[in-house]
């Protein structure tokens, strides 16, 4: 389940591994842990929301958070959304391709496969020379090296959209 080719030493192969059961057992343990936590005293409330992190959810009051846990993507050519989308399908969160597309579109751009024609996150950091100069250097080097593939032409845009998306996200979460 990846674009890379890799091989394991055949002696270490697990034939007919029941990976779904192993994964399900871990999920069940996490659920049991959460149930156990509910029995503890002095537990603070928490809220988990599925939203585009660049758009502050309207149902969260300003200054109502003590902590924000986030796991931002890192710009590279590993499409981390594949795992998210696979998990969502396995858990029956989504049943239609459109839902998967909307999930992917709602994530901060971190690789060339996550850029959409209507993305404008990069516009939010065009005044920051530290970032735009890096994107410009990447694009200039691509041209110097004669790289012409579609994804290579998008590398510099990933930098702009990633940092623009992170800027929007952090500004929204600061509210």
Task: List where the protein language model places each region.
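Generic recognition of flexible, low-complexity loop/linker segments
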Residues: 54-58, 158, 171-173
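A short glycine-rich, Lys/Arg-flanked "PGG" loop and its adjoining helix->strand segment in the class I
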Residues: 91, 163-175
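Acceptor-substrate binding/catalytic loop of class I
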Residues: 153-164
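Nucleic-acid modification enzymes, centered on SAM-dependent nucleic-acid methyltransferases
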Residues: 1-138
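Short glycine/proline-rich turn/loop motifs
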Residues: 141-155
